[in-house]
Regions:
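Helix-turn-helix
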Residues: 1-18, 22
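Amphipathic alpha-helical packing segments from all-alpha helical-bundle domains
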Residues: 26-36, 49-56, 60-64, 80-105, ...
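Solvent-exposed, amphipathic alpha-helical segments
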Residues: 30-41, 121-129
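Amphipathic alpha-helical segments used for helix-helix packing
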Residues: 59-81, 127-132
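Hydrophobic/aromatic-rich alpha-helical bundle segments in the mid-to-C-terminal region
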Residues: 83, 102-149
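Generic C-terminal helix-cap and adjacent flexible tail
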Residues: 154-156
């Protein structure tokens, strides 16, 4: 481990909140970059395959981030600046999914809203898999239902 003085850290960040924001942003950016590299390679484009690939890649990349994401959500609820900052990062994620869809012929009305709903559904699978598992739910059946719902939503 490299030793870094507190003074060095605070020369880049004004306080602990900025350190947390910078660390979370770097962490989420690295995961998102990997996700989009995978999704950009889906060719030839087929919506059903894209959605299944999106779900699998998202679960693989984000499932280990459950604890960090819970901590970040708690910070977002307590601090308007953090909330606004990470809302902007989420918007980039939604826009990138919409961009991939648009580039591949998906030009439906209300695409942004449909992408947002789809992202929430995909993330609910991550939560179920890694953080808030419910007894009595068949995860594979749930995953199939989410995939079918997202494909249908993005096809309308």
């Amino acid at each position: 481990h490299a030793k870094v003085s507190t003074g060095t850290v605070y020369s880049y960040f004004k306080d602990k909140k900025e350190i947390y924001m910078g660390a979370y942003e770097a962490y989420l950016d690295s995961i998102s970059t990997q996700l989009f590299e995978r999704l950009d390679k889906v060719q030839p484009f087929c919506l059903e395959y894209f959605v299944n690939h999106w779900i699998s890649a998202y679960l693989e990349l984000y499932s280990g981030a459950g604890h960090a994401l819970v901590q970040l959500r708690m910070m977002i609820m307590d601090d308007a600046e953090i909330s606004q900052h990470f809302s902007g990062l989420e918007n980039k994620y939604f826009l990138k999914i919409g961009e991939i869809l648009g580039r591949n012929g998906n030009t439906q009305n209300n695409r942004s809203e449909k992408v947002y709903i789809s992202c929430v559904l995909v993330d609910s699978l991550r939560q179920e898999k890694s953080a808030f598992t419910h007894n009595g739910l068949d995860f594979e059946a749930l995953k199939q239902q989410v995939a079918k719902t997202v494909v249908r939503l993005l096809s309308e």
